[in-house]
Structure formats: structure tokens, C-alpha cells
Amino acid sequence: MTSEVIKFPQFPEFTIHISLFINVSSENITTIKSNLISATDNDHNKYDYCFLNTKYIISKEHLFQSIYKSLLNYTSKLGLSTRNLKSEIIYNLSPINNVGDALKRFGISEDCPNCIVIKIINNNNKENSEETKISEKVTTDLKEIIDGELIELNDQYIFENFIDLAKFRKLYKLNDVVDLNKEDNLQGRLTRLAIGACILRGY
């Protein structure tokens, strides 16, 4: 099992590696958080990832939209709303116009044993020209950092195992919008509503 690799046609120069780890111990998560804060220049590349908990990510589309919006800001005159591309991804998952709140809700957390890890690589860098080797290296490096099980990221597993619908609907203010008993494609419906809430954030 290796990381899932995606590209957006609008950003051919970037390759996105996405990994899902489950059953990660709280001690391991604490260590990762500590190293993210205290990493020296020599350790920077080792922890140059976006670490997310899985509590409020409803689908892959929800995640991809956040990555896409972050790359759009990164490459345009709009610029980032946060310090870097990694925190921008976290911020763009949130419907709340507060970076600190987004980091708290969506960042890696000891109370969630599952984490999604994202690595964005600029292919214009000659060192990153061989994608297969890069993908294998990303997976190998992450397994050295994370003591958990790497599994496939798929919508059914996300929806059935990670999401607390009551908390999700409360965060995205969807309690009066969606009838859980009448929606045939509930995950798709909630995904679109969550993305809409993020797009309209601050208005």
C-alpha cells in the first residue's frame, strides 16, 4: 500500500500525495505534534506534511476541494490566508473564518486515532522529476513517522467509520437542512453543503 497520488489539470506542476493512517496511538500523535512545532531546519523536510484528523472530513471531494482552493490561493495574486500551504489546506476545510479554530478542529489530534496526511510536491524542482520514486519515498518516510496502519482512502470507509453526523451537521450548520432519513445520497448531499459553507465563509 502506497499513498494515493492525484493531480489537478489546472495545476500540472504540483503532485499531491494523500495517505490515510488508522489506529495511531495518542502517544505517537503527541510526538508528531511536538516535532511539528520544534522541528529544526534539518528536520523540516521530514515533517513537511499537512496532518489532519478525520472527524469532520465527509468525503474525498471535500478534501480535494480544500487542496484545490489552497493551490489556487498559493498560485494567484490572492495569496494565502495562513502562514503556509499546509495550514491553508486545514483552514479551507473549515466553515469558520478563524485560522486557530480550524487548526484545532481539523489538525492532528490525540482524541482521533486516524489521520490523513498530505504532501504537495512541486514538479518543477528537478529533484522531484521521478514521480514513482517520490511516491515510494513519501510512503516510506511516513511509515517512519507514524505508527499506524496505512489503508486506502475511499468514500465509503470515510463515511461509515469516521463521521459523527450530529457533530458534522452542527459545525457546518446543517441541522435544519438535511433529513437523514430521506436522503438517498446523503454523503454527496452533505459534501456539497459543506463545500458551499466553506466557499461562503465570512459572508
UniProtKB/Swiss-Prot annotation:
The keyword Signal does not apply. Component of the EKC/KEOPS complex that is required for the formation of a threonylcarbamoyl group on adenosine at position 37 (t(6)A37) in tRNAs that read codons beginning with adenine. The complex is probably involved in the transfer of the threonylcarbamoyl moiety of threonylcarbamoyl-AMP (TC-AMP) to the N6 group of A37. CGI121 acts as an allosteric effector that regulates the t(6)A activity of the complex. The EKC/KEOPS complex also promotes both telomere uncapping and telomere elongation. The complex is required for efficient recruitment of transcriptional coactivators. The keyword Cytoplasm does not apply. One of its GO terms (biological process) is tRNA threonylcarbamoyladenosine modification. Pfam families: CGI-121. InterPro entries: CGI121/TPRKB, CGI121/TPRKB_sf. It is found in: Nucleus; Chromosome, Telomere. Its main location: nucleus. This is EKC/KEOPS complex subunit CGI121. Keywords: Activator, Chromosome, Nucleus, Telomere, Transcription, Transcription regulation, tRNA processing. Belongs to the CGI121/TPRKB family. It comes from Candida albicans (strain SC5314 / ATCC MYA-2876). Component of the EKC/KEOPS complex composed of at least BUD32, CGI121, GON7, KAE1 and PCC1; the whole complex dimerizes. One of its GO terms (cellular component) is chromosome, telomeric region.
